[in-house]
């Protein structure tokens, strides 16, 4: 069945005054095409828009789709032949053409053939051209602003006398309206001595009425407009000689209403004028205030302001008014570039239909509106430019954002709070969803705060300080994440969260507009527009609280953020050798690491520089290097100012060294003060003013060879076409033995724990029985010195008759990280080789780490099945037939054999068994060989050490 289109709908819409339509016509889509913008800049990318040709079966009219309807075109729901019903639309005159802007529609039927033979409809109001020879001096502009709509004597220029055709005006709340005296759009005119004011029936407009008092006949010849002459219907605006009081409604589709009148060049009869479209209108702030005809006072238009929804805002509406609640407001920020500087702030708006949009104020507008805008209040906002939203910083569901102008825009607070407008609109995401989200994504979060860290002060890249505080958030998804609070959030809200967590209660917190990052795994941080509410009153909050109290508090949780140690932010702990070995800093982003090292050398030729002490508009110090003018004054090129006393700041270059190597690093003022404990100006005065070289040298020497924790920024930089790795110390603190011990113990605990959280080593690991001398497995690190009966792997030492090597012979020798002995490295240690051989032959794993326990992975010997020792130290019979190849007896290895070997392993010097020639206590027959190993500890038998470097 062929659908029924609304007859005459296109003509009715086209002849309707600018503004929202009052009918809901059924039309057919004849064509759909994307809107292409010529000479558009490559960035920012304009929002994608589509235009349609709509038909009522007889006439067609161009239309523009709201961006919210773009998905209907992309999924082919809207295509040629589709029959739709327009439920919300408006009609405006754009560049001399009537355009229907479709806000909402219903799709009634698809795949219909084109009904009838429709032709393009040209509105009668656009068929007449204004006389181009009309001089501007004969007209006067009027900036009458009313809350009614299209002006009955709208903006016009007096037409030629022969123009007698009747024309309807097209006023409205969304663009420059035309009134009863025609249009002056695009025509620049000079103010005249008299003016005719006008009112209409739609939203607040600025009607540009143009007429000339010289062209008007004397009062006796002039037809006086009154309520009878201007009221074809009961709903039409009325005008009296003394008052102008428009009614609240205008019959929108009656072409006979709101006729325009103008004074001809001669005579006193009003006639319909012509219009001139397609030229830019003169800004309203350049127009003089309205001057009414001398016929008595004119009353204020008290009709209600026409409000449009936020979703209907688009750049094609020069005049609009929205009613919305401020849901968020940013702090005022200072900015500067090479061309200008100023202030800026933004705020988010939400209306009763759920539409959201962001408004920005720059420079003078920021100073004017910042004090007026309050979060939670409802405002009427009119006039402002709409620009494409920068989605990198603005994630509201709108393609545009408002820029308020100090001369055009108006912001009026509503005295009564409109309860139909929600206070905030959330789109909560679960923490588990953040794992696969891209960085810089803006999200809303709701979760339980499980822990709060103390606040800390850090230095920004621009040189200013800011505060940060980290909290852990947990939700129903069984995931947790670290959220960083920045700036003012650390004080009020952060302190409140800290107190509640310390008291045992876990508050629930809602974030609006937090940003996802990849620091420390996955994390979330606040930004300038983020909103934070503690224990909000949402239905989701109660459900989350009940879950946490019943099961969530004790339920296992997976953290998306890497765990932090107890020393605040801990960047990866690295050695100096690892900087080169792991190619740190070679990628696009710098690497942030922490190095434990000592300062071995400080370059003192230029350890500081004179800096500009002036404050920049952004609130931080300039710090640019100042130049001495030679007359006692210093000059800054950036600030272009001269001053008498510069501020000296550190610019250090020094060498740091640890047990793996050394490298050069740089440090600026903050890190330099942490190293020397005094300002650069004091050190400069000691050396250059007091010329006390001895004290200066003492200060420099005082910082050498002390252990520090250096927080380094490692980045590859290019200088003179050469790439080099640069290490910059951004924070330096002296090593605290207590804190460092906690860090090391935590690292050891992580090594000792298997994935189930249970240690493979004995409970007394690392301790020796002082009575019996029996050893248990220990967790001592590779640099521990063993002087008791066991080494760091729990190996029982052999005690045998023999003399120890003198202490002097062990100086400056290497310390083995496996057996703890001196004189060799771990790579050639026979203990490690024997361990690998035994456990591989017995079906066990090699001892590559602390968790690799012989054979079966338990803490007992796999040979005798008894705890307290490893298989390599088993005193009982081995099940694998591992016996000493010298004496053929089980219970020990050849390196610990106390009897003479059958292979004739005797000292060739003294011809006595039990030791090798290198360990011979007697006189050597030849040149004395240097001894190897460290036999100071009596518990270490010489036979063990005799194996070093031999077999």
UniProtKB/Swiss-Prot annotation:
Function noted in UniProt: Component of the replication protein A complex (RPA) required for DNA recombination, repair and replication. The activity of RPA is mediated by single-stranded DNA binding and protein interactions. Probably involved in repair of double-strand DNA breaks (DSBs) induced by genotoxic stresses.
Segments forming C4-type zinc fingers: 612-639
Protein name: Replication protein A 70 kDa DNA-binding subunit C
Origin species: Oryza sativa subsp. japonica (Rice)
Subunit description: Heterotrimer of RPA1, RPA2 and RPA3 (canonical replication protein A complex). Interacts with RPA2C.
GO MF, one annotated term: damaged DNA binding
Pfam families in the record: Rep-A_N (PF04057), Rep_fac-A_C (PF08646), REPA_OB_2 (PF16900), tRNA_anti-codon (PF01336), zf-CCHC (PF00098)
A GO cellular-component term linked to this record: DNA replication factor A complex
Region listing for Disordered, in residue ranges: 139-172
DNA-binding region extent: 320-403
Keyword DNA repair listed: yes
DNA-binding recorded as keyword: yes
Source species taxonomy: Eukaryota, Viridiplantae, Streptophyta, Embryophyta, Tracheophyta
Cellular compartment(s): Nucleus
Gene: RPA1C
Residues annotated as signal peptide: none
Record key words, sorted: DNA damage, DNA recombination, DNA repair, DNA replication, DNA-binding, Metal-binding, Nucleus, Zinc, Zinc-finger
Similarity comment: family membership: Belongs to the replication factor A protein 1 family.
One record GO biological process: double-strand break repair via homologous recombination
Transmembrane segment boundaries: none
